[in-house]
Every structure is written in C-alpha cells, then in structure tokens.
Amino acid sequence: MKSKVFFTPVKDAEDIDAVNAGLKLLLAKSGVPAVAEAGRKVVVKLHFGEEDTDSFVRPAHLRLICDEIAAKGALPFLSDANTLYRGKRLNSEEHLGVALEHGFTKDAVGVDIFIPDDT
C-alpha cells in the first residue's frame, strides 16, 4: 500500500507565517489532529537538531502542530530519542540542553518536552 505524501511549496523558509499557513493546510488535509482524543497524551516526535546546527523544524512550526492537537482536547508534548553516537544527544540532560538552545522552550512551543531516560 502506498502512503499519502502531503506537500506544500515554501518560497521563504524564514517567513514563519507563510510556512505555518501551509502547515495548517497540510494538517487539515492529513487529518492528523483529528485522531487526538480529548484528555489523552499525544507525543509529537521530532529531531531537536545537533549542537551548532540549524537543521531542525523551527519551534514556531511545532507550536502550531501542538496547538492544533490541544484544540482537540488532547495533551501534546514533544519528545526525541537519545543517540548511540557521541555528542550532546547521547544523554537526556545534555539532549534537553540542546533542545532549549535551539528554542524549544515551553514559552515557545506551549508544551512540555520529555526525553526518555538513558537506561
């Protein structure tokens, strides 16, 4: 079975409002927020980026996704898995530090961040 792929072109990735307008349309067409059940926790799995890089989804876009899920009465939170290779994403404490350095604060995304233990 082929998976559906949703795409919207972005002319200026730095134009947060334009990107979020396309993202909101994609969320509506995909139906992803509709599967969120009121009162249930929903993990939004993402990659917080490596130290000293900018190759990750911007917090403002995650805010929109989490807001759409929360509008259904669900309780979204952000999460990522630690890595097996050396670096600041090898353990949960430093991994959270990288997430915060990249702007994934509760003020920015509106939800908590949970990175599972190292064990």
Where are the language model's segments positioned?
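N-terminal and secondary-structure boundary signal
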Residues: M1-T119
